[in-house]
């Protein structure tokens, strides 16, 4: 992708729900360089906490089609962006985005999602800690 956003998270184009994150362009390659060694021969489910624009999970799902990726975010605008990226990419190994609130006792998951996500290969999180709310 050659587009470089002006703002930290801006729409790709007017009317397009896909957000384009500056941090994705800066760090998806070095993050994948580390993750790929760990994920290369492991099957299973990977939950991304705080998927933001959705660009990282789409890129990583392309690179690791043997894994089933579960995007999540607490922000509805980000959920919309993740879903727009998912539709655009047409990957079979990316689940629908879940609204996930790590501050909630059950993370706000349905019983079905809780059961599925109790068997994870990994939980991945990047570009979140510095913007997380503190009690």
Locations of regions flagged by a protein language model:
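Class I SAM-dependent methyltransferase Rossmann-like catalytic core
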Residues: 2-43
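Conserved class I S-adenosyl-L-methionine
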Residues: 42-52
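Class I SAM-dependent methyltransferase SAM/SAH-binding core
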Residues: 59-109
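Short amphipathic alpha-helix with an adjacent loop that forms part of the alpha/beta core around
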Residues: 106-118
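A conserved beta-strand element that flanks and buttresses the S-adenosyl-L-methionine
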Residues: 124
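Hydrophobic adenine-recognition pocket in adenosine-nucleotide-binding enzymes
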Residues: 128
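A short, conserved alpha-helix within the catalytic core of class I
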Residues: 131-135
């Amino acid at each position: 992708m050659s587009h470089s956003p002006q703002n930290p998270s801006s729409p790709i184009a007017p009317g397009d729900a896909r957000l384009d994150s500056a941090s994705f362009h800066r760090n998806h390659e070095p993050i994948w360089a580390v993750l790929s060694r760990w994920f290369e021969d492991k099957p299973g489910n990977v939950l991304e906490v705080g998927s933001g624009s959705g660009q990282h999970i789409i890129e990583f799902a392309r690179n690791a089609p043997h894994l089933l990726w579960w995007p999540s975010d607490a922000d509805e605008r980000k959920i919309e962006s993740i879903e727009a990226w998912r539709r655009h990419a047409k990957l079979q190994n990316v689940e629908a985005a879940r609204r996930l609130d790590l501050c909630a006792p059950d993370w706000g998951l349905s019983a079905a999602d809780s059961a599925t996500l109790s068997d994870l290969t990994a939980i991945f999180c990047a570009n979140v800690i510095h913007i997380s709310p503190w009690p």
